[in-house]
Amino acid sequence: MALWGGRFTQAADQRFKQFNDSLRFDYRLAEQDIVGSVAWSKALVTVGVLTADEQRQLEEALNVLLEEVRANPQQILQSDAEDIHSWVEGKLIDKVGQLGKKLHTGRSRNDQVATDLKLWCKETVRELLTANRLLQSALVETAQVNQDAVMPGYTHLQRAQPVTFAHWCLAYVEMLARDESRLQDTLKRLDVSPLGCGALAGTAYEIDREQLAGWLGFASATRNSLDSVSDRDHVLELLSDAAIGMVHLSRFAEDLIFFNSGEAGFVELSDRVTSGSSLMPQKKNPDALELIRGKCGRVQGALTGMMMTLKGLPLAYNKDMQEDKEGLFDALDTWLDCLHMAALVLDGIQVKRPRCQEAAQQGYANATELADYLVAKGVPFREAHHIVGEAVVEAIRQGKPLEALPLADLQKFSRVIGDDVYPILSLQSCLDKRAAKGGVSPQQVAQAIDDARARLAL
């Protein structure tokens, strides 16, 4: 049953109906629609539209419907209803008869769907926050047991300076902490209820919208009805949060794909998150990580698509806004799945310390230490930089690391270099010297782990 048939003398073309209907995806808002309807029934009592007994009958029927939906949400898709609002109203009328037709008094699908979607977003944000913190915790635990795993750090995918696997893990903890903060910030802005704004001009009934918002668990009610029914900022913000979060997960995946490769060999992934080849029996492919990396693109696409949908819309509601849900649902589902999968990847990962150490000792990652040593001897940094570059060329020519060059060879480039240079060039010295806050020194890494554990209550 359509909710708008009285104005029309012809039935909708079946092709238009299929094009127009949204039940196939907005069925996911069933629980929120029912919860919102219960609250609206209470509001109608306060303005005399419903008696207390009528409201009780409606609430009881809606609660029964809620349990039926929770038991089998797929039943909704067997209906020919236009959207979830039509489906809920139809089911309610089946249960309570003509009384069910009174529930929509003073309410529009415009404020109804805006409310449903915000309720869904609030619940989903809480799920995302939980998954985000679980991944942060997994990274912290992985860092805890790999504080002594020295590996090369990279710039331009070239070995740059030695770091530890723990320090690498903590870098992603920081990214995820920002993702968490963004979600919490978004939650504050979407925590306002549009219910009671009607189609665009507000409801004709003197409903206490602040009280209504409180019944639904919102912090407050919105302030302008035109804006309220056409506002999809929270959709854009959540898609933006998801896009940024997925970029972080994609980088995480790319790093581990490289670390797991035969060329690097720094880690080995668990059999539980890898797959084989149908042709090459030796292969162990990092499919979980590659899928995380690949799924990043669809989330970016959802954000771009929603921005383009909204950019030219006049106030207030337009049917274009029906396009807000599929992209949002898919993007947040994808982000949530990838957060869980990233945590699973860390569960069982093996860090190959000898190979990491070997790689850290290659590539002249201690060259900066030699430059700093020269600066400490009074050589201007720019000159020291040039001297070390020449020393690296000589080391490459001899096929040796810097610390293996004889003192006489080093002194060809600067007479200030003495025997005391060799301890400075050790990997441990390279790490120990980075002792400022945020650095890779063992003390700073241990402190960062302690701070993260305290924040996450581990």
Curated annotation (Swiss-Prot):
> Which keywords are on file for this protein?
Amino-acid biosynthesis, Arginine biosynthesis, Cytoplasm, Lyase
Q: PANTHER family, alphabetically?
A: ARGININOSUCCINATE LYASE (PTHR43814:SF1)
Q: Which reaction does it catalyse?
A: 2-(N(omega)-L-arginino)succinate = fumarate + L-arginine
Q: What is its main location?
A: cytoplasm
List the GO biological process terms: arginine biosynthetic process via ornithine; L-arginine biosynthetic process
HAMAP family documented for this protein: Arg_succ_lyase
- Species classification: Bacteria, Pseudomonadati, Pseudomonadota, Gammaproteobacteria, Enterobacterales
> What Gene3D superfamilies does the record tag this protein with?
Fumarase/aspartase (C-terminal domain), Fumarase/aspartase (Central domain), Fumarase/aspartase (N-terminal domain)
Q: What is its EC number?
A: 4.3.2.1
Subcellular localization, per the record?
Cytoplasm
Q: In which pathway does it act?
A: Amino-acid biosynthesis; L-arginine biosynthesis; L-arginine from L-ornithine and carbamoyl phosphate: step 3/3
- Report the SS bond pairs: none
Q: Which domain of life is it from?
A: Bacteria
Q: Name one GO cellular component term.
A: cytosol
Q: What class of enzyme is it?
A: lyase
Offer an example of a GO molecular function term for this protein.
Answer: argininosuccinate lyase activity
Note the InterPro entries from the entry: Arg_succ_lyase_C, Argininosuccinate_lyase, Fumarase/histidase_N, Fumarate_lyase_CS, Fumarate_lyase_fam, Fumarate_lyase_N, L-Aspartase-like
Q: Output this protein's name.
A: Argininosuccinate lyase
Family as reported in the entry's similarity comment: Belongs to the lyase 1 family. Argininosuccinate lyase subfamily.
